[in-house]
């Protein structure tokens, strides 16, 4: 899902070159005639590859070879050294990290807890108390220490246990009573985590975005938790072709009559990602929009444009996608520009936040069902997708990149290869059962009543709980709704008691205005918490 007002103005900024890593000789190639992954020896790889190629080309090029991306352009699958833990992953917007409570998060299936200590320093631990495995994210902060609320064990700094209430006064705290720590960095308003506990953090891999460091650069940033895999999410974000159709009239830049062939040019490929330009065929196919994907999950869409005053301006659409387990992902979206539109200044930020939620909801059904098919079919995307040259170039590039490095991930679906998860999604998310999983998830923290049960299809749990500004706005609207409703009732009662017709009219008119204002607050609350429902129409 590329957000509509982004898709027509995407471009790339120069970054440091991406270095190739050593290539290993044993890829895993999937034979599309079966439903299993086949590890092949280097000597047999080309033979097996040829068998697959012959069928795929004859099937997919018949009646469409001039418009379909050729799935057999490469003679072999190139495999690169890769370890998913030796990467920086985006955790949260710094401004939204709670000051007074720990925050439970995940990267793939690894559960971690993030909090601020007494000095405001960010700390990240494994979300598991060494005592009896209770979630530390369900704990509390006391004097800058993270306390497990099960038995009161307290931890600080580099995971050291500093208090065990049940321990005799003369006894020393065991050295084993410590928690595993992860390195975190606050960079350009985003908290990043280094997932490896064996390899020291590599500062050169920490993303840096040139546009966001420019003087006067203004951005609107939102966080969204989504019910589909991060690879599906990335595919959607790098797909400008769907925007005029799926997001028709969501804002003034998305119109279905503008759907047209697109022209793509790949300008860079490496083991760390790819980059290129794209443009609309009707505009001569000029690549004024630039896209860059950097491992493991960073997508940039940038554009440079000149204003009427001759000053060069910069626009960025930045998507930071964190895998949070099978069929789940979390996305930080950041739209920024050096020249702010007057409309952005007039409308409140919560309006843009709910509009972003609406865009994700428009695509949610498509992407969730796509995720379901991939999990059921258990074959590479080349056996399922019909990628067009004029719309799907970035999607094919991304899946081919997965072919190179997917062996170093917990699981992957590449263009030609797959590696399936070790455990089924249901077992990963609910090993002790659905109710136990709900009780142990954020923000339920033990409570699974209708008010607190997490539901990733619901806008409140996808965005509001992760956004401090929207949470505060809803609380304010709720407060004013109650005040105005009570005032309207009081004015109506007073109007009944007074004798003067003139005062009755004034009081009833005031009550009507208060009721209208209370209704407006209710509508604003609904706008921020209720999902968009697509209304189909005959065209």
Curated annotation (Swiss-Prot):
User: What is the name of the protein in this document?
Assistant: Protein TIC 55, chloroplastic
Question: Which gene underlies this protein?
Answer: TIC55
Tissue occurrence? Highly expressed in green tissues and very low levels in non-photosynthetic tissues such as roots and etiolated seedlings.
One GO MF annotation is: chlorophyllide a oxygenase activity
Task: Give the transmembrane ranges.
Answer: 483-500, 505-527
Q: Which residues lie on this side of the membrane: Chloroplast intermembrane?
A: 501-504
Q: How does it assemble?
A: Part of the Tic complex. Interacts with TIC62 and TIC110.
Motif Redox-active motif residues?
467-470
